[in-house]
Curated annotation (Swiss-Prot):
Catalyzed reaction equations: oxaloacetate + 2 Na(+)(in) + H(+) = pyruvate + 2 Na(+)(out) + CO2
Top-level taxonomy: Bacteria, Pseudomonadati, Pseudomonadota, Gammaproteobacteria, Enterobacterales
EC class: translocase
Binding partners and assembly: Composed of three chains (alpha, beta, and gamma).
A molecular function (GO) term: pyruvate carboxylase activity
Xref: InterPro entries: Aldolase_TIM, Biotin_BS, Biotin_lipoyl, Carboxylase_cons_dom, OadA, PCB-like, PYR_CT, Single_hybrid_motif
One GO CC annotation: cytoplasm
Name of this protein: Oxaloacetate decarboxylase alpha chain
EC code: 7.2.4.2
Modified residues (N6-biotinyllysine): K557
Length: 591
């Protein structure tokens, strides 16, 4: 049986290797060659790409999809969809899910890999049904993980539930690289023995087991696998396409792909990748810590990047040790977007504040309340009681509690566009969906769609190193430099060589934050993380009780409620919505 290959170079490869920064301008020159290979599909959209396009790159993700479809008409295009979460970080009403899928199909999407971070089939049903109703390929997903709560029967039961919902195929998604070769053989064999279904396997290379797992899965009867072109493979990413093609050549599983065509593509990305070196993670080879922490490849690079932003890069090992403990408290949930971000952010909070759950992120509270769906086992009872504050947890499908919201969202976006003088796209619904998924950054993107200066500068290849170093080397490290009101993150190597500049939080638009509370003025309320103020809730002179929410901080793509550690009166509010803050900045004081 010929094995179908899905190459993930245009989506998960760069999401895992360099924080989802690959730009459309670096995809289109090679698109025709990719289209000519004969892949089963090309993953090129979804996951974190939508967020990265509007947050960092200043690209319209809908335009990206249309351009890729135009450039690669022969090959099915594939995306990763987070079920009821779509591409955002909360559940959306069914009417939003339906319209998003419709627009994705109309813009060029063919194959939808639909997963739910909780492995709750109720959260995948609406998306899967929408995909099939619009004539696209619906692939249900088992987000693979291990824990005392997960057995072979867990995966067989979920497979059966997905088949009852209605799918065209099923993917086993090993986002952390923890699927052992023997477990892969057993899982694929047992699913194939019990069910008539096309089966696909996705593995990450982070722990060094992925190639072996793919081969054993192929022996067991898997129909297709994910790989990445060699120059965009390994470490945090995926097994190399060429290696598997060569391994299977001349066997009953021969992929039929031309190794010479693949090498030309690899050569192209070998050069392109050099431009994105500033976003690369530190991993060389494999990382056995993942066998314990179960951190997906993309999450690991993001954790490293985010800890640097918090000036806490040296705390990575502590965070990795804390992640399994947080995961257990949250019912042994799998670590895949958005739960990977939720668990990772909570672990960072626990480490940086020096006290476990001193601050509970809004999304962590959501899992404890049941707002994301069923957890594999019950969550930590004490933490749940703390966030429920006497109310009952959610036990129904979370989206059943949501009223239709598309009409209201559309009216709101059109109103804001009129007020701000924003010209919406020809298909305005695409812009509406962009803002629906990412309210603040989506609107900011629409305001600056034609203003590249509002986003990260174009990446550039690292300059050649000089033959001789300066006699007095500069101190190496990562610094934030302000140039004409804009802040940039700069890496300075030993000897003073400056590599890629990347945009930091805009400096000019942010109000200066009070550095410290004057002596005797009260107890300072400080920022536990670097980020942006989402909303200031407390008002000057307001009396608050211990535990009251004072403001909401957006950091690491999550919302963190900053609560009063004691009763008092709010004085000296030093921030407003949209302001950038650093760790330890005083936000207000409690007198």
């Amino acid at each position: 049986m010929t094995i179908a290959i899905t190459d993930v170079v245009l989506r998960d490869a760069h999401q895992s290797l360099f924080a989802t920064r690959l730009r459309l301008d670096d995809m289109l020159p090679i698109a025709a060659q990719l289209d000519d290979v004969g892949y089963g599909s090309l993953e090129c959209w979804g996951g974190a790409t939508f967020d990265a396009c509007i947050r960092f790159l200043g690209e319209d993700p809908w335009l990206r999809l249309r351009e890729l479809k135009k450039a690669m008409p022969k090959t099915p295009l594939q995306m990763l969809l987070r079920g009821q979460n779509l591409l955002g970080y909360r559940h959306y009403a069914d009417d939003v899910v339906e319209r998003f899928v419709e627009r994705a199909v109309k813009n060029g999407m063919d194959v939808f890999r639909v997963f739910d971070a909780m492995n709750d089939p109720r959260n995948m049903k609406a998306a899967l049904q929408a995909v099939r109703s619009h004539g696209a390929h619906a692939q249900g997903t088992l987000s693979y993980t291990t824990s005392p709560a997960h057995t072979l029967q867990t995966w067989l039961d979920l497979t059966e539930q997905l088949l009852e919902t209605g799918v065209d195929s099923i993917a086993i998604k090993d986002m952390s690289g923890i699927l052992t070769p023997m477990a892969a053989f057993e899982l694929v064999s047992e699913i194939k023995k019990r069910f008539e279904v096309r089966l696909h396997l996705h593995c990450h290379a982070t722990t060094g087991m992925a190639e072996m797992a793919l081969l054993k899965a192929i022996e067991a009867g898997v129909d297709g696998v994910d790989t990445a072109i060699s120059s965009m493979s390994a470490t945090y990413g995926h097994p190399a396409t060429e290696a598997l093609v060569a391994t299977l050549a001349g066997t009953e599983h021969d992929t039929g792909l031309d190794i010479l065509k693949l090498e030309n593509i690899a050569a192209y990305f070998r050069e392109v990748r050099k431009k994105y070196h500033a976003f690369e993670g530190q991993l060389k080879g494999y990382d056995s810590r993942i066998l314990v922490a179960q951190v997906p490849g993309g999450m690991l690079t993001n954790l490293e990047s985010q800890l640097k932003q918090q000036n806490a890069a040296d705390r990575l090992d502590q965070v990795l040790a804390e992640i399994p403990r947080v995961r257990e408290d949250l019912g042994f949930i799998p670590l895949v977007t958005p739960t990977s971000q939720i668990v990772g952010t909570q672990a960072v909070l626990n480490v940086l504040t020096g006290e476990r759950y001193k601050t509970i992120a809004k999304e962590t509270a959501g899992i404890l309340k049941g707002e994301y769906g069923h957890t594999p086992v019950p969550v930590n009872a004490a933490l749940q009681a703390r966030v429920l504050e006497g109310s009952a947890p959610v036990t129904c499908r979370p989206a059943d509690l949501l009223k239709p919201e598309l009409a209201e969202l559309e009216a709101d976006v059109r109103r804001q566009a009129q007020e701000k003088g924003i010209t919406l796209a020809g298909n305005a619904i695409d812009d509406v969906l962009t803002v629906a998924l990412f309210p603040q950054i989506g609107l900011k993107f629409l305001e600056n769609r034609h203003n590249p200066a509002a986003f990260e500068p174009l990446p550039q290849a690292e300059a050649a190193q000089p033959v001789a170093k300066a006699e007095k080397p500069a101190a190496s490290g990562i610094y934030t430099v302000e140039v004409e009101g804009k802040a940039f993150v700069v890496r300075v190597s030993d000897g003073g060589d400056i590599s890629q500049l990347t945009t930091a939080v805009p400096a000019a638009s942010s109000a200066p934050v009070q550095a410290a509370a004057p002596a005797g003025a009260g107890t300072p309320v400080t920022a536990p993380l670097a980020g942006n103020i989402w909303k200031v809730i407390a008002t000057e002179g307001q009396s608050v009780a211990e535990g009251d929410v004072l403001l909401i901080l957006e950091a690491m793509k999550m919302e963190t409620e900053i609560r009063a550690a004691q009763a008092g009166t709010v004085r000296g509010i030093a921030v407003k919505s949209g302001d950038a803050v650093s760790v330890g900045d005083t936000l207000m004081t409690l007198a």
